[in-house]
Amino acid sequence: VPARDIYYYLTLSTIPIMILWVSVIIAQAGGNPFSALRDANVAEVRGIRTAAFFVLFWMVSYIMELQVVSRENIRRVIVLFIANFFYAFVSMGKMNFMILFLATAIILTERKIIRIWHLIIAFFVLLVFFVGVQKMRGSYTNPRHFTALYLTTSLANLDQNVEPSTAELPAENSCRLFYAIKSSLDGGETPVVDPILEFQWVKIGDLKYYSNTYTTVYPFYKDFGLIGVVGFAFMLGLIFGYLFKTAEDGSQFSLVLYAILAGTVVMQFIGDTFFMVLSQNLQYLFAALLPYIISKYNLFANTFARNG
């Protein structure tokens, strides 16, 4: 299938670029190299930002190969898994590990290759990874503290520190993408909300935590109050309901996109990872849709036939 080949060889050709970037960042890191890698994932460090557009194709390529995993393509699957794991590691981003874990679990469950007890074991392994990533970044190292921070503080943080309908600009959180586009066009004059939210103290019983998670309703609640929460919840329900239904009906495109975006559903108790990073999700949409356009219209078929 030409589309799968194109994505696979695109991945192979861009892995050396990522390795070079990571080598430069680590070589020039003044302190904690893992912290420097994290900084390079969310903003440029000496002109380098590891959150490159091409890594989206790595994930889509991995899922497409995993959908048809067999003895014939198992090497590809392993190479692509290692590539995506490598990126998740060097990005020092827990969400990237989550996407890789969930995408793998969803596809293998759909293929009836793994069972529930496999998922339970994998979940605890993922939790260990999360604690390890947090420790390497120089943040919280206590597993109990880490678990409590992410499982208990979000709702309390929303209740204690966020007032409804208090956004400085209309829909600046829910429609962040439009402000980002406007900012890029006017030379940065339009302010854009940082998707990494502000840390604030949260009191739970006699304990206090320093947290920047507010559950998935934060952008809608802050922009529009309870009406926004209801409206955007309905919108998300339609989107994910459609993807799930069409994936169940056999749409491979919907299955790929659902596998990638499933983290949005799982992470709702922590924060919104759909609308506030809509630009990235639209790029995933493009990367997931392109192979099926290539296959449907036999794009590049003549090129592969000549080279074959």
Residue spans for each PLM region:
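Short alpha-helical linear motifs
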Residues: 104, 123-126, 142-148, 255-260, ...
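Alpha-helical transmembrane segments
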Residues: 6-13, 50-54, 76, 119-123, ...
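Hydrophobic alpha-helical segments
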Residues: 209-308
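Juxtamembrane/interface motifs at transmembrane-helix termini
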Residues: 118-120, 136-139, 250-253
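Central hydrophobic cores of alpha-helical transmembrane segments
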Residues: 76-86, 119-127, 237, 255-264
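Membrane-embedded catalytic interface detector for glycan/lipid assembly enzymes
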Residues: 1-114, 127-141, 305
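Hydrophobic alpha-helical membrane segments of integral membrane proteins
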Residues: 94-102, 117-120, 231-232, 278
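Small-residue-enriched transmembrane helix-hairpin modules in multi-pass membrane proteins
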Residues: 36-44, 129-241
